[in-house]
Every structure is written in C-alpha cells, then in structure tokens.
Design a protein with these regions (language model features):
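Basic, Lys/Arg-enriched alpha-helical interface segments
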Residues: 1-64, 73-76, 84-107
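Portal/gating segments that form or line small-molecule/metal binding sites
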Residues: 67
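Conserved Hanks-type protein kinase catalytic core
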Residues: 70
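ATP-dependent carboxylate-activation loops
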Residues: 80
C-alpha cells in the first residue's frame, strides 16, 4: 500500500493562496512522500518539527513556504497548515495552529 497525502479544508485554502512556484514545489514534495513514504524522504524536503508534527519545506523564486503535517492511520499524511515563512525559525504560532487543528481532527 502506498502513502497518501491529504489536506484538511483550511490547508487547501492556504495552499491556494501560495504563489504558483511554491504550489508546484508542494506538489513535488507530496509526490515524493506518496512514492517513497515519510521514512525515506528527508532533508531538504521534510524534517521533524514538534511532537507528532513534521514540515514539508518549499522554496522558490517567490519565497519560502512550509506545510505542517502529521502521519495518520492507514498510511496517510494529513496536511494541517500551509504558510509563507518570513523568519529563520518556524513561527510558534504556525505550530500552535497545526496542533489546534490536529486536536479538532482527533487523529
């Protein structure tokens, strides 16, 4: 069975707001995760973030973006939050948003 990347509704809306090159990078990282699984995809594409959270890392000519996701049952990766990154560190607020959405989903 292969891995599947799913976006919650809020993350889909956030992804739609990204510039085209960052959306394309997101799709590429998602394809890598689906094809090889999260255990075999590492830096520079993904890295652990906090608790159960991981981040997809996208960069392009229009900036840097991140997508925070969590592994769920049934070889699913659920994207909880997508945002444009403006500072060196991942903003605490982005992590808190992802954790709140995870709690709502009760995965």
């Amino acid at each position: 069975m292969t891995w599947q990347v799913h976006l919650i509704e809020a993350a889909e809306k956030e992804l739609a707001l990204l510039p085209a090159d960052l959306k394309a990078r997101f799709l590429r990282v998602a394809e890598l995760l689906e094809a090889f699984g999260p255990q075999k995809v590492g830096l520079p594409h993904v890295r652990p973030l906090a608790s159960k959270l991981w981040e997809m890392r996208m960069s392009g000519k229009d900036g840097i973006a991140r997508a925070v996701y969590v592994a769920a049952k049934g070889q699913r990766l659920v994207v909880l939050h997508v945002f444009v990154k403006k500072t060196q560190a991942t903003p605490r607020r982005a992590i808190e948003t992802a954790l709140a959405r995870l709690k709502e989903l009760e995965l």
